[in-house]
Amino acid sequence: MADNLSQSFDKSAMTEEERRHIKKEIRKQIVVFALMIFLTLMSFMAVATDVIPRSFAIPFIFILAVIQFALQLFFFMHMKDKDHGWANAFMISGIFITVPTIAALMLLLGVNKI
């Protein structure tokens, strides 16, 4: 086994189409990563420069956070790929449980009095 270390390895078993697909996927992930950095900078700049009115700042940042969360789920957690039916079902059911719970807590605690 140690004698074979000086020999070069065989080419990968990937086809040219698979290599193109992987390169395309890497490009997509880089673009999405840059978009998420842009969204983060946009939320920081919106607060730091007072461009957004105070009454709209929190909803604006929340909207950007939801967009960023969706991008992370679909591109970096690979939820857009097939065979993730159970994971998608759990995520959707979690959202349907979380949103009414947060809304009820806001009403109960009186947080909506801004």
Swiss-Prot record:
GO terms for cellular component: cytochrome o ubiquinol oxidase complex; plasma membrane. Keywords: Cell membrane, Membrane, Translocase, Transmembrane, Transmembrane helix. It is an enzyme of class 7 (translocase). Its EC number is 7.1.1.9. It is found in: Cell membrane. It is a multi-pass membrane protein. InterPro entries: Cyt_c_oxidase_su4_prok, Cytochrome_c_oxidase_bac_sub4. The chain crosses the membrane at residues 29-49, 56-76, 89-109. Pfam families: COX4_pro (PF03626). PANTHER family: CYTOCHROME BO(3) UBIQUINOL OXIDASE SUBUNIT 4 (PTHR36835:SF1). Belongs to the cytochrome c oxidase bacterial subunit 4 family. This is Cytochrome c oxidase subunit 4B. It comes from Alkalihalophilus pseudofirmus (strain ATCC BAA-2126 / JCM 17055 / OF4). The lineage of its organism: Bacteria, Bacillati, Bacillota, Bacilli, Bacillales.
